[in-house]
């Protein structure tokens, strides 16, 4: 009999692997819990800028839910059923109120305070006065452009400043009969620019607007400039017969200095509110009527835009202005009288009266604000800097606009159309029609029967070298 075999069992590895797995699992759970606590509980929240960037860059997905579809259908149905006047949301009644505007723009202005004797006094705002340095730069650029335009058009027969002044001074309805034709001998439009400063906003009473009206006051000063106008004319003695005696007169008027307080405010259209006693009626303002009507805006039979209220910019000067004028005169032909004081007083009084009758309180000048709605007729393209060789005296308006820095869109369209026409011409010449557009040499080769020339003429543009010609 065989003895029982004492077989030794190998050591089990399952207990060791189970222990390792348990420890590894516990360790991973601890790491996950620690990472969660560190990054989600004690982590810093993202900044508002990063949240805004992520929201802007996130892809937009349309929602095709039933509720959104029903809402869109109901909204479109309500828009179709409602009147056109109810589509635009109503403007709050306090939108033009002075207090509301000042509160929303964070400007502290003290309104009018009434005294016991029923008189009111204007208080300046508690806001610090503005220096208006940026405004001076803009006004200087505008005046410089006007001066340059006036100099460029000095030789124009219709739109020069000399012809305009001569026509105005020789107006038959205003010029007396004892003054001969007035000839302008010298014009100087100056070299310096007005300086605006100390701007402040005040609230004034206006019966035509709700809550009063805001008015900007700014000091303006113009000195050491060369604004002058020189004329020559003859004084006629029409008794006992017309032009029985003639007295030559030469005058030169120069503005030495001007300073004052400019008042600027916005007033509503006189057509929508009652006419103010200090504002002229639109029927008396022939210059305020547009000379060129916009085809997109309806007009009535008189050519006036109908149904569109216009807001105007009103500006004037306070009565405490200063206008210093220098007048030089020369009277006579042989024994001339120079710089007569009485003539200087008369001319200065006339200029002062002309100025006060137009832009000194309580009289104001109204300028209708233009429409700022974007239109293709006013659209331009900013040109590049490579226009040094372009002549400014060119008669092409597109070239002038390009030289000034902007090119009208119409000019771009014309150039694009011209390039298209040129390309079409090139395509026609490539086809080589012998009866219409072939040159004289090509026609002679065709009449001689030169097939090689014909094949070269009828070769497709862009074909490979050595490719067979089109039959």
Curated annotation (Swiss-Prot):
GO molecular function: lipid binding
Ranges annotated as biased composition (Basic and acidic residues): 280-295
Location of this chain's protein in the cell: Endoplasmic reticulum membrane
Keywords from the UniProt entry: Endoplasmic reticulum, Lipid transport, Lipid-binding, Membrane, Transmembrane, Transmembrane helix, Transport
Lumenal topology ranges: 1-21
PROSITE patterns for the chain: SMP
Transmembrane segments: 22-42
Cytoplasmic side: 43-471
Biased composition annotated in UniProt, kind: Polar residues: 401-410
GO CC entries: endoplasmic reticulum membrane; ERMES complex
Region Disordered, annotated ranges: 271-306, 395-415, 448-471
Keyword Transmembrane helix: yes
Superkingdom to which the source organism belongs: Eukaryota
Gene Ontology BP annotations: mitochondrial genome maintenance; mitochondrion-endoplasmic reticulum membrane tethering; phospholipid transport; protein insertion into mitochondrial outer membrane
UniProt similarity note: Belongs to the MMM1 family.
Assembly and interaction partners: Homodimer. Component of the ER-mitochondria encounter structure (ERMES) or MDM complex, composed of MMM1, MDM10, MDM12 and MDM34. A MMM1 homodimer associates with one molecule of MDM12 on each side in a pairwise head-to-tail manner, and the SMP-LTD domains of MMM1 and MDM12 generate a continuous hydrophobic tunnel for phospholipid trafficking.
Domain notes: The SMP-LTD domain is a barrel-like domain that can bind various types of glycerophospholipids in its interior and mediate their transfer between two adjacent bilayers.
Annotated function: Component of the ERMES/MDM complex, which serves as a molecular tether to connect the endoplasmic reticulum (ER) and mitochondria. Components of this complex are involved in the control of mitochondrial shape and protein biogenesis, and function in nonvesicular lipid trafficking between the ER and mitochondria. The MDM12-MMM1 subcomplex functions in the major beta-barrel assembly pathway that is responsible for biogenesis of all outer membrane beta-barrel proteins, and acts in a late step after the SAM complex.
Name of the protein in question: Maintenance of mitochondrial morphology protein 1
Organism: Arthroderma otae (strain ATCC MYA-4605 / CBS 113480) (Microsporum canis)
């Amino acid at each position: 009999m065989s003895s029982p075999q004492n077989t030794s069992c190998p050591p089990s590895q399952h207990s060791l692997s189970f222990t390792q797995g348990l420890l590894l699992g516990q360790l991973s759970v601890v790491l996950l819990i620690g990472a969660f606590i560190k990054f989600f509980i004690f982590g810093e929240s993202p900044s508002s800028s990063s949240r805004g960037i992520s929201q802007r860059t996130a892809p937009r997905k349309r929602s095709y839910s039933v509720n959104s579809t029903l809402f869109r259908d109901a909204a479109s149905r309500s828009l179709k059923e409602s009147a056109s006047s109810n589509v635009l949301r109503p403007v709050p009644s306090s939108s033009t109120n002075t207090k509301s505007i000042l509160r929303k723009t964070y400007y502290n202005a003290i309104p009018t305070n009434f005294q016991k004797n029923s008189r009111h006094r204007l208080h300046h705002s508690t806001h610090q006065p503005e220096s208006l340095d940026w405004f001076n730069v803009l006004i200087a650029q505008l005046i410089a452009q006007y001066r340059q335009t006036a100099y460029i058009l000095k030789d124009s027969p219709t739109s020069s400043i000399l012809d305009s002044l001569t026509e105005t001074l020789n107006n038959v309805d205003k010029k007396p009969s004892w003054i001969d034709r007035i000839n302008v001998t010298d014009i100087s439009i100056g070299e310096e620019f007005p300086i605006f400063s100390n701007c402040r906003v005040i609230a004034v009473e206006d019966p035509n607007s709700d809550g009063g009206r805001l008015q900007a006051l700014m000091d303006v000063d113009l000195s050491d400039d060369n604004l002058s106008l020189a004329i020559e004319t003859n004084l006629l003695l029409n008794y006992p017969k017309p032009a029985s005696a003639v007295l030559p007169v030469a005058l030169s008027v120069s503005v030495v200095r001007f300073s004052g307080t400019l008042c600027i405010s916005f007033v509503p259209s006189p057509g929508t509110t009652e006419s103010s006693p200090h504002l002229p009626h639109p029927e008396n303002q022939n210059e305020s009527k547009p000379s060129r009507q916009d085809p997109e805006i309806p007009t009535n039979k008189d050519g006036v835009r109908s149904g569109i209220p216009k807001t105007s910019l009103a500006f004037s000067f306070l009565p405490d202005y200063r206008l210093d004028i220098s007048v030089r005169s020369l009277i006579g032909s042989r024994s001339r009288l120079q710089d007569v004081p009485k003539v200087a007083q008369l001319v200065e009084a006339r200029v002062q009266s002309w100025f006060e009758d137009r832009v000194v309180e309580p009289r104001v000048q109204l300028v209708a604000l233009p429409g700022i709605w974007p239109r293709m007729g006013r659209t331009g393209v900013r040109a590049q800097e490579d226009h040094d060789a372009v002549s400014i005296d060119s008669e092409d308006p597109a070239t002038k606009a390009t030289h000034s820095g902007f090119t009208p869109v119409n000019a771009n369209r014309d150039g694009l159309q011209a390039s298209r026409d040129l390309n079409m011409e090139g395509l026609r010449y490539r086809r080589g029609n012998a009866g219409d557009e072939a040159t004289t040499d090509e026609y002679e080769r065709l009449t001689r029967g030169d097939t090689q020339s014909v094949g070269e003429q009828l070769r497709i543009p862009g074909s490979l070298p050595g490719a067979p010609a089109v039959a």
